Amino acid sequence: MSIGFLRQALNALQQQSRSRTSHRVNQWFKWLSPGLSIKRWLLISVGGVLLAILGLAIWVKLTPIFWLLELVRGFLGAVANILPNYISGPLVILGGLLLLLWGQTRTVGSITQVLRPGAEEELIDVLLAHRRLYRGPKIVVIGGGTGLSTLLRGLKTYSANITAIVTVADDGGSSGRLRQEFGVLPPGDIRNCLAALADEEKLLTELFQYRFRAGDGLTGHSFGNLFLTAMSDITGDLERAVAASSKVLAVRGQVLPATLSDVRLWAELADGRRIEGESSIPKAGGKIVKIGCIPANPPALPAAIKAIKEADYIIIGPGSLYTSLIPNLLVSDIADAIAQSQAPRIYVCNVMTQPGETQGYTVADHIRAIDAACGERQLFDAVLVHKKSPSAQSLIRYAQQDSHPVFLDREAVSQLGRRIVLANVLYEDKTGFVRHNPQKLAKVLLKWYGGAHHGK
């Protein structure tokens, strides 16, 4: 074995040791970060130790303390002869503080090992993230379908004060079957939002989204839908079922149904037909001229109205225009609360038109449809539009389904009194499937909120 090899090994060990030491010291000093409410308790602990020493001194009539002080005095005198007091003093103080901090962190670490076994993150990092997220803005997001859950995955990294208000008009697929067989409100969109906001382990979220592929009566159902249906029966209604499920998944924020009424959508088409049922409307293949619900003006969930009134920021969309977004706004109390809000409000327009709902629609057409459904009230101040067109591969794929990019007609949008926010927020996979990128979308929305909020 050569001397050079040994030297390299020793250098590698030294670098690794320095790296570990630096990381540990960095983790210790994180406990002194502002906003954690740690430093005050640390100072109280130090005060308690000093007070206990003083009490002990009084109890033993101070005699041993004098001996100890004389010993310390002699030691300090010897140190002062070697190092000046302006150097030795701060060094001793720093050493004492490091020992105290090290002892505190090791104590907390021992407790954490029991409470959070196998956790990959350091407790201090969890605390810092928790403080940052729970100091984030109160954001209300309104919509449904995959568009809403995509946005929530991005927003939850900026704030834990998120309220997702979700449509309950779905009557297709697993949700529709459960609605028909058990008389429960459709849980599908709520399940997707809970999974998107979940802060629990990935395996638990995957379990919630698991869809059965076989089994008499189980095929097509997702575990989360069945879980929410069972919880609704146990707790008495969907609102309490969602609250209980949120605890299981450690959800950041809350998910609320727009209403607890059994809502059924209807649409009038340009050819005079009237189509009933959320899943039947896109299949009808006509131009939608009017949309409503049975019963008309269903009562809003009080918690949803409260969240809107307290919101710092309101986001509408993305999602299917007529079957995910507008059904929430047909609950007149929700539309009223949004209209009266002084918070910054923005609409996230879809990237592509949707067959059976918005063929040929421009950005302005989307805005007009929302305004018409809400009695021509202006529920948002700006519209977020994707800047670039998808790839040729995606355009060909979507054209086969009669779906095309939503055209931005700037002048028409400006005439409707809306500001335009242009940004690259698209995600495109290898097969040409496009959707909003959760992280990019959330970043752009929070940046616009910062400008709108400070501009007030």
From Swiss-Prot:
Keyword Iron appears in the UniProt entry: no
An annotated GO cellular component: cytoplasm
UniProt KW keywords: Cytoplasm
Lineage: superkingdom: Bacteria
Cited CDD domains: YvcK_like
GO terms for MF: LPPG:FO 2-phospho-L-lactate transferase activity
Listed InterPro entries: CofD, CofD-like_dom_sf, Gluconeogen_factor
Places the protein is found: Cytoplasm
Membrane-spanning segments: none
GO biological process terms on file: regulation of cell shape
Function text: Required for morphogenesis under gluconeogenic growth conditions.
Family assignment from sequence similarity: Belongs to the gluconeogenesis factor family.
PANTHER family in alphabetical order: GLUCONEOGENESIS FACTOR-RELATED (PTHR30135:SF3), UNCHARACTERIZED PROTEIN YVCK-RELATED (PTHR30135)
Name under which the protein is recorded: Putative gluconeogenesis factor
Organism: Nostoc sp. (strain PCC 7120 / SAG 25.82 / UTEX 2576)
